[in-house]
Amino acid sequence: MTAVISHVTSIDPAARARPEVMAQFRRHSGSVLSGLFGAAAFDEVALVPVAAAVDKTGRFERNFTDRAIRSGFSALLAIWGDAEDRAAEGERLKRMHRDVHGHGKGDFADVRYSALNPRLWNWIAVSGMFVTLNSFTPVTGIKWNDAEREAAYQQLVEAFSALELPGKAGKFPATYIEAAEYYDQMVQTDLAANPFLDRVTAGLGKLPLPSALPAPVRAAAAPLWSVVSAGAGRVVKICSFGIMHPGVRELTGFRWQPHHDVEFNFYTQLLQMAWRVLPDRVVLVPLAYNRLQYEKLVKMHRSVALDSFAPPGGCPMG
């Protein structure tokens, strides 16, 4: 099974980040294939105040697919958007989360929460970054070294910098090593099994249709979706739980067995084949694809520029 958290205590000084690997990681951060690992972010609701908050709104539980799409689109904007768009998205999220505070309901009636509490906010951010990091090798088949993992983490920290809260407590872990230590500590001391985590884990057995689809499309797709959703949910569950921290997976009640390793390897081999043979237009989300096309065009435009505007052949007065 894929190792989720590498307990790296130092980076080999001889290790170097290979440019081709970093380019592949950047592509991966905009790939539709990584969506199959999205349920690894269930670690977010293993932090009970987060579970209380999302349980109170009901949106997560009503339609997990919608919630995943919204979160994914926001993250993609942070990674692939222009600087102005990234900053605007960060401010939008902070502004909208100001109203997310109070007491939970039902099983969480005694739980107080505030979305802008750095303890909750940073946990969700680090969770999202680790989903992208931990799904890289399963999707691409590329095995990276410690320096490359650190460079990839720094890419994500820079992309999500607009989400950091003010003050020292609002800063994300500065290095991958610190982030891994922080994650392990949260698993050991802060996370807990809870009814909401149980419900969303069980809900993977039948993924709902996205409500953003036009009503006629939803109506036409509903019969087929009712057949394929259980299978799709199974793939998402195995892929996601295959990269999930063992301590978090234990909290979900899901017991990983040897046959799950076989299933995980089968799915990831198919993903790696798709990664190798499918064109970017298919593998990447439109925002990432168009950004890369733009960068290629910029490079082409600059390739015809002169190195200098000085007269050729040296000084004419020489």
Predicted regions, residues:
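Mature, function-bearing regions of proteins
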Residues: 1-318
